[in-house]
Amino acid sequence: MAARRSRTYRLRLSCEGTARFIDCHHRLARLTGSLIPYGATLFVAMLLTQGADPAEIAAEISLAAARRSRSDREHFVGASDELSSIEAAVGELVEPSDLLSGRPSQAAIFIAGIAIMASSEDKAIMAAFDRMTRLVAQV
């Protein structure tokens, strides 16, 4: 039996960004009817972001609300190491954008993902959760 691989991800969130993440986490927990780890919320947010239009992702990264959500205040969540490849793929999607001068930081991508999850419909969130469950089971 192979050991599951996980790692810790750093979120740099302001009080506003932290509140938004917790709102997303609470919503996902309600939808699943489970006590889920914080890493599951971040993973679902990134899966939703990976499926979003690159222009929407770039816009979220460049919005003033995204800048207000960032901070030097660090939070750590554990999730499958598969999340790294999803975050990298999202970064590559938006790198050539007119709205951004270069590849966004991991922190900016995570904040955009949280914003995209906050505006997603319940059905899309549950589809992303189901996909995450399948991806993590394969590892």
Where are these regions (language model features)?
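Short Lys/Arg-rich basic patches
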Residues: 1-25, 29, 58-91, 107, ...
